């Protein structure tokens, strides 16, 4: 393998936005979608969404380009309790350019550590991002 693994830094304004997002008080679903600026080698904000379901979020993701998502999800437990887990979702669709995938894969752990997240999931097809999929993944934590 001739290419070395590139680990991109996280843009300072994005670090602050993630910190604020972590402590938000709103009770609806919300997402921060991030991408890599390959020229600057930085993880930057792509889009911020409020009141978005997993199915609506899926429609915002490019089908052929990787993205990082931090998603605040209103999780209704079977016993009636409600929690708001923060999920990190790495969307790495099949058919992405290999160098792009390597750059995202190499930067994922640094971003997860920066955002201090523990619920980390990956999808290889944007169509997989559904409410059912997310509830199943979160079921392991609750």
From Swiss-Prot:
Cross-referenced SMART domains: ADF
Gene Ontology BP annotations: actin filament debranching; learning; locomotory behavior; negative regulation of Arp2/3 complex-mediated actin nucleation
Keywords, in A-Z order: Acetylation, Growth factor, Phosphoprotein
GO cellular component, one term: cortical actin cytoskeleton
Stored InterPro entries: ADF-H, ADF-H/Gelsolin-like_dom_sf, GMF
Organism: Rattus norvegicus
Domain ADF-H: 4-139
PANTHER family assigned: GLIA MATURATION FACTOR BETA, GLIAL FACTOR NATURATION FACTOR
Cited CDD domains: ADF_GMF-beta_like (cd11283)
UniProt-recorded name of the protein: Glia maturation factor beta
Gene Ontology MF terms: actin binding; Arp2/3 complex binding; growth factor activity
Role description: This protein causes differentiation of brain cells, stimulation of neural regeneration, and inhibition of proliferation of tumor cells.
Residues that bear N-acetylserine: 2
Pfam families: Cofilin_ADF (PF00241)
Free-text description of this protein's post-translational modifications in UniProt: Phosphorylated; stimulated by phorbol ester.
Family named by the database record: Belongs to the actin-binding proteins ADF family. GMF subfamily.
């Amino acid at each position: 393998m001739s290419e070395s693994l590139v680990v991109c830094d996280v843009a300072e304004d994005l670090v602050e936005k993630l910190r604020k997002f972590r402590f938000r008080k709103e009770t609806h679903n919300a997402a921060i979608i991030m991408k890599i600026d390959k020229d600057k080698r930085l993880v930057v904000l792509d889009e911020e969404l409020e009141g978005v379901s997993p199915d609506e979020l899926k429609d915002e993701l490019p089908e052929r380009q990787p993205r990082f998502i931090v998603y605040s999800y209103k999780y209704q437990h079977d016993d009636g309790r409600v929690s708001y887990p923060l999920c990190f979702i790495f969307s790495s669709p099949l058919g992405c350019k290999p160098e792009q995938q390597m750059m995202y894969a190499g930067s994922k752990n640094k971003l997860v550590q920066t955002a201090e997240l523990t619920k980390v999931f990956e999808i290889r097809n944007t169509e997989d991002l559904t409410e059912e999929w997310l509830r199943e993944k979160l079921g392991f934590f609750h």
